[in-house]
Swiss-Prot record:
UniProt function note: Beta-1,4-glucuronyltransferase involved in O-mannosylation of alpha-dystroglycan (DAG1). Transfers a glucuronic acid (GlcA) residue onto a xylose (Xyl) acceptor to produce the glucuronyl-beta-1,4-xylose-beta disaccharide primer, which is further elongated by LARGE, during synthesis of phosphorylated O-mannosyl glycan. Phosphorylated O-mannosyl glycan is a carbohydrate structure present in alpha-dystroglycan (DAG1), which is required for binding laminin G-like domain-containing extracellular proteins with high affinity.
Pathway where this protein functions: Protein modification; protein glycosylation
Binding-site list for Mn(2+): 241, 243
Source species of the chain: Danio rerio (Zebrafish)
Biological process according to GO: muscle cell development; protein glycosylation; protein O-linked mannosylation
EC number in record: 2.4.1.-
Protein name in the entry: Beta-1,4-glucuronyltransferase 1
Source organism, top-level taxon: Eukaryota
Gene this chain is encoded by: b4gat1
Length: 431
């Protein structure tokens, strides 16, 4: 009898525990469904679902993205790449009046990148604070991620929304699609905002080395430069790599200079390019830069890899020139182009485009500088502005096929120089 009572009590306790466990499971299931419903609701707010497509106020940014993607983009001249121009437009570009004088939009910055380097946009925009046109190359699964992250940047980052135009380039056999099903890319972003989007980009920075995107995948750097250039209506454009930063107030200095004099039709304004150790804070002015230059923390761009490629800039002369950090840009001296100089410059939008047959590593920028020279341009070096590359360029950091690509593009460059003779038959200049 005593044993029977014990057994009954045990059954009651066990039953109670089972009921409690079952209730906990039901509660957790309910919470999970509720969380999923909340996430779906938040996601539908971002991208819109078929159910709520006609309800409430439309998101013009989302609708523009949908339209841009629905066009399927356009093929480049080679037919190997698909280009989505103005995938997302900035508020600045959207508010530009059709037919407005391009001089009212004086200077824009054009740049190019893959997803693994797009995180540099944050510091670039923080320094530049003016219109930027960004051409992004994506391959494979990155096409879907790039589309999603571009939209997130434009949605959650006010400065990006205000000033950055995005263009997307992928292989012709791939297509960008609206990120309806990509919830995993956006979990938590709405609550945490812009810092979370750039943190997500940071997690992709080591996905692959520059130019080592995948087997049989060529980074079309000159196509991207042209897409970024063509994506702005500015009268003048500065084309740089996304891991470079201009000196502070460059845009204001240039606009102030225009009040006194415009560059001649055959003139580009060269910005001396430097590179700095990763651990250093980025100098904003020439005095700050020169101080670091004198102690070896800053050196000419490509100093270790190809000192001849930037030597014509005449860094020793430039460093010792007295100049004002504020006020208009000042032209200090003019240089005739010599091989193999690869200057970075501010040029009119009429400057010849980059030759898009150059891809991967080698001769992609020098080919365009060579054409400027043959076309009769002069290179005027400014004394109070500069560009800075993040980190020293060293031999060991490059991908394994760099030398092979360089040899291939050297052969292409020889052919390109011959074609310039036919394009500019009356020019006495040669590269």
């Amino acid at each position: 009898m005593h044993f029977s009572k014990k057994c009954s009590v045990f059954k009651v306790v066990l039953s109670a525990l089972l009921i409690v466990a079952l209730l906990q499971l039901l509660y957790l299931s309910f919470l999970s469904k509720l969380h999923g419903k909340q996430q779906r609701y938040k996601y539908s707010e971002l991208f819109g679902s078929k159910k709520n497509a006609n309800q409430g106020e439309k998101n013009p940014r989302r609708e523009h993205l949908r339209y841009s993607l629905s066009t399927g983009g356009i093929f480049d001249g080679s037919g190997q790449y698909r280009v989505y121009k103005n995938l997302i437009k900035s508020d600045f570009s959207t508010n530009q009046k059709p037919g407005a004088d391009p001089r009212s939009h004086h200077l824009a910055l054009a740049t190019h990148t893959t997803i693994n380097n797009l995180h540099h946009l944050e510091s670039l925009l923080e320094r530049w604070k003016n219109p930027i046109s960004v051409a992004i190359f994506a391959n494979g699964e990155d096409v879907k991620f790039a589309t999603a992250i571009i939209y997130a940047l434009s949605l959650f980052c006010p400065q990006v929304q205000a000033l950055v135009d995005f263009h997307l380039v992928c292989h012709s056999g791939e297509m960008a699609t609206f990120p309806d099903q990509d919830r995993e890319h956006f979990v938590g972003l709405q609550e945490m905002g812009c810092p979370a989007v750039f943190a997500k980009l940071e997690s992709h920075r080591d996905k692959y080395k520059n130019y080592a995107i995948g087997s049989n995948v060529s980074y079309p750097n000159n196509l991207l430069r042209n897409v970024a250039r063509g994506g702005t209506d500015a009268a003048y454009i500065l084309v740089i790599d996304i891991d470079m930063i201009p000196s502070a107030n460059l845009h204001h200095q240039f606009v102030t200079m225009l009040m006194k004099r415009e560059p001649a039709a055959d003139e580009v304004l060269v910005l001396p390019a430097f590179e700095i150790r990763h651990i250093r804070k980025m100098p904003a002015s020439k005095p700050e830069l020169v101080q670091l230059y004198q102690v070896g923390e800053v050196r000419p761009f490509y100093d270790e890899l190809c000192s001849r490629c930037q030597a014509p800039t005449n860094y020793s002369l430039w460093v010792n020139l007295a100049s004002k950090s504020s006020g208009p840009l000042e032209v200090s001296y003019t240089i005739n182009w010599v091989d193999p100089w690869e200057p970075f410059y501010i040029g009119a939008r009429s400057v010849p485009l980059y030759d898009e047959s150059f891809r991967q590593y080698g001769f992609n920028r020098i080919s365009q500088a060579c054409e400027l020279h043959i076309a009769g341009y002069r290179f005027s070096v400014v004394s109070n502005a500069f560009l800075l590359h993040k980190g020293f360029k060293v031999q060991g950091e490059f991908h394994s096929r760099k030398d092979e690509e360089n040899r291939k593009n050297r052969i292409l460059f020889r052919s390109f120089k011959e074609s310039l003779k036919a394009k500019y038959p009356t020019s006495p200049r040669r590269c």
